[in-house]
Amino acid sequence: MLFPEAFQNLPAPAGPELFEVDRLLKGSGLLRLSRGGLNLWAVERQPAFLFMKKGGIDFYIKGGISFFNCRHLLMENIRPCGDGYEMEYEGTGQYYQPFGEYQGTNDWWEMDHSRRRTSGHLSVKVKATVTPVDDGFDIRVQTWGCPASTIRFEFGILPNVLIRGEGYRIPANAGGSLVATKGELELFDGKDTVSVGPGFAVNDVIKGLFGVGGPVQPLFQRRDKF
């Protein structure tokens, strides 16, 4: 260094809790945010559409849906909205009514399905909103459309993190899973903490739901379903 005295009065580098990033790469369908030491990446058209990291805590959020032939919540059109960003998904389909009379054959493939009445166009929409706050992000999900659709959000968490919730504390082991039926939970790696919730669920299915995609074995899965 030729002139060390020129750097003597510079302020100390900001810690990760003060480091802020806010960048939308619209052409690539990517969003990069950082607040309070928590980093977030949003990706369009991927089942795992949110990735987050704070210190040694790494996890993703993946969306699945049971709606006709739709199984993945593939978010699209990440865009600015108020103080944050939003993205959306729309699934469509139609239900074929029974024939109502014998078709002259028991072979499903030989039947004239153009004669069947349908329910008409049905759709379900999901909108996720990400708003930066002082110590992280406020993430909210809205759904509307076909009322009987079942939607799941899965949190995949790297091992060696302790999961603390109402009435339980368990390690995030590879291949493990739980359904958080109520309340908040914390992800704790011995140094940093990430709070998630509230969670809720209306069924007891833990694995093999919807065919959203095979679980990533090195990760622990936490699922919310509604």
Predicted regions located by residue number:
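Beta-strand-rich recognition/accessory modules
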Residues: 179-226
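Extended polysaccharide-engagement surfaces of secreted carbohydrate-active enzymes
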Residues: 1-190
